[in-house]
Amino acid sequence: MIVLGLETSCDETGLALYDSEKGLLGQVLYSQIKLHAEYGGVVPELASRDHVRKMIPLLDQLLNDSQVKKSQIDAVAYTRGPGLMGALMTGALFGRTLAFALNKPAIGVHHMEGHMLAPLLSATPPEFPFVALLVSGGHTQLMAAYGIGQYELLGESIDDAAGEAFDKVAKMMGLPYPGGPNIAKLALQGNPETFEFPRPMLHQGLDFSFSGLKTSVSVQLKKLGEENRDADIAASFQEAIVDTLVKKSVKALKQTGLKRLVIAGGVSANQRLRERLEHSLSKIKSQVYYAEPALCTDNGAMIAFAGYQRLKAGQCDDLVVTTTPRWPMTELSRPAEIIE
């Protein structure tokens, strides 16, 4: 089965082809970073328009690069949510229309389920069950995953997501969008022990809170005034985020008794986070798994793969185009429940 995956939840237009026998046949990705950089963040209307502009050229490029004909596509998977309504609708309408024209099934995929399953595309994929740390611009969650659609929410951010905190602090510091990679780069030049920023809720269950940390950075920047300590600020802020994510992940593993941690989402590409996780998990004889670098950010491959997992169990959507900007993963059903 060859599945076309379409990702348009925010500011990246990603398309990919996944073959159930050969694996990933190819993928293309167009990032709107330059488009939104001058605004310091994503402008939903501009994002939607750019998805419309890029969808067909990217599909043509993907088919050409992969040497696959449209007629060979067996199914279409698109991001149904969560995400920006207009951006989601663009991908959903395109995917549904293409599937209808080809007389093939289509399925809407949960964006974060796609992220969580992306490490399964690696050369050494994790086996279920595992704990998943999902960290992106819109989500920070710890999930226990026992199988496709068998997810238990262990903890989540009660305010800002980790990626959102990175972007907001970067904006305070005058760094360009997107903030996460730029803070990480600047942090390499700084001392993470210079400023003792708070780790909110560190010892309170498995939920996260990053708004207080963001406020603390703002206060410190005002105190410094014209004094340039940006590298130390970046390093200390990043360390506070990483410290919280690592300690909560270790706590989740101990609480569930599981020995495998999957980390996914855009923030999972952060090298300091990876270093700290590998060090901490080695102490408790647990393993950590990541997606390949190209699959950490939003992409079509994770949507194609997640879609295939459900399509092979008999799940598909009807002709009604549905998008769900707010969609908890715990509301997803097991594929077996759908065909029983």
UniProtKB/Swiss-Prot annotation:
Keywords: Acyltransferase, Cytoplasm, Iron, Metal-binding, Transferase, tRNA processing
Matching CDD domains: ASKHA_NBD_TsaD_bac (cd24133)
GO biological process annotation, one example: tRNA threonylcarbamoyladenosine modification
Residues binding Fe cation: 111, 115, 298
Extent of the signal sequence: none
Needed co-factor(s): Fe(2+)
Keyword Transferase: yes
Top EC category: transferase
Coiled-coil segments on the chain, per record: none
InterPro entries: ATPase_NBD, Gcp-like_dom, KAE1/TsaD, Peptidase_M22_CS, TsaD
Residues involved in substrate binding: 134-138, 167, 180, 270
GO molecular function: iron ion binding; N(6)-L-threonylcarbamoyladenine synthase activity
Physiological role: Required for the formation of a threonylcarbamoyl group on adenosine at position 37 (t(6)A37) in tRNAs that read codons beginning with adenine. Is involved in the transfer of the threonylcarbamoyl moiety of threonylcarbamoyl-AMP (TC-AMP) to the N6 group of A37, together with TsaE and TsaB. TsaD likely plays a direct catalytic role in this reaction.
Family: Belongs to the KAE1 / TsaD family.
PANTHER family documented for this protein: TRNA N6-ADENOSINE THREONYLCARBAMOYLTRANSFERASE (PTHR11735), TRNA N6-ADENOSINE THREONYLCARBAMOYLTRANSFERASE, MITOCHONDRIAL (PTHR11735:SF6)
Identification of the protein by name: tRNA N6-adenosine threonylcarbamoyltransferase
Originating organism: Acinetobacter baylyi (strain ATCC 33305 / BD413 / ADP1)
Lineage start: Bacteria, Pseudomonadati, Pseudomonadota, Gammaproteobacteria, Moraxellales
Gene: tsaD
